[in-house]
Amino acid sequence: MKKQNSSYAQLRIGFYEIRFQNQTIQELVYEFNQLANSHGWTAERSYFSMALMNEIIRRDINVSAIVVQDDKNGLVVSIHYNPVRYDEVSKSLVTFS
């Protein structure tokens, strides 16, 4: 994990890089790493997306968007948070098929 500033953390899991845009989420990095290992997220992108979203829903994290992009280093998942309730922003979640 590299810290760019007090409100940014990132975790690289194989080809996947997960960026946490809220400093209160940084303590989840280790747990996400364990979850990724147990679910084999490096194998199937659609499964990766589903497992990630299920974990976010389970924790009732306030998410404004999940943005998934490919780059030359692999898959980049950016998770954006805001202070509204999850059910108010669930329609803005962006995933891939």
Where are these regions (language model features)?
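Extended, charge-rich alpha-helical interface modules
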Residues: 2-97
